[in-house]
Each structure stands twice: as structure tokens, then as C-alpha cells.
């Protein structure tokens, strides 16, 4: 059921086709979705995620860190199933989806910092719009090596890390008591441990 749900949310070309709806009567825009569905997306191989790990709504519904985590978990599922020689069709489907996600991350989820260096975007929509930031939750851009998506010395990751830990990231804060990453959920000028 999980792989079918991932595949369904990956194959959307129109968000109104998704069975998932959410609307909260609230005053904070980060707490609910635009017209119960969120912002438009274009099918591109990534899996839709209406919410961030912080439980704030996504600006663009393809969350790159979550997609990276999903592909590594799909690869792990396939490895386990194949090693046990069970559910080989499910394993092959998981590997196919993981491959599609990986290609889409590198095609749609890579952008440039202010110096022109390639970095991973935080969120994208498939139309070419990107959100350049990071949030201190996991999965996050900083956690990509921890998730097993990239090596910690990968040049693209190192560029992304430099971006995330700089004032180019709107949620990187520096003060007299410390510096670090926060997020929209906690607000401006707050870091999360």
C-alpha cells in the first residue's frame, strides 16, 4: 500500500486528482493548504508532499529532502525483499520508482546559489520554481548524507551545505548566543537544536 501511495502521488499531473485534501480554519498560512490541495504541481517524477517534516505546508509540493529519503528507503525495501527472494515484483517496482525519483531530483531539484554554484533546492514544483532554504527538521538538505542519499564529501552537497549555513538561507540565524538553522514553524530569529 505504501508503494502504491508513493506511486500515485508521483504520477499526479493535476493535484485535484489526489484523494488527499486538507483545510484548517486558521490564520497562519503555513498551517493549511491552498483550496485544500496546495499549489499547482507538474508531473516530473518527484513525489508530492503537501507538508514539510515540521508539519508546515509546502510552498512547492515536491520536497527534495523527503524525496531523497523516499528513494533511499525504496532502495532498502527492494534490497531486503530481493535478499529474501520474496515479493520480487514489489522490489522491482520500488527500484523503478526510486530511479525515477533520483533522476527527477537531479533534473528539477538542483538550482544555483547567488555565486552560481549548483545546490539542491529545498522544494520545487516541476514548473521551474524553486525554494532555496533549509529547515532544521529531518529530512533536510543538511541531512542528505545521513539519509544515505549522497556522500558527505559530494561537491553538490558541500555547495548546498555552504548555502544552508550562510545568510543566503532565510532560516539561518546568527546572534550573540549562537548560530544555526530554524524554520518557518518556529519563526524568525530562532534556531532549533
What are these regions (language model features)?
Residues 23-43, 106-109, 153-167:
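An acidic intrinsically disordered interaction segment
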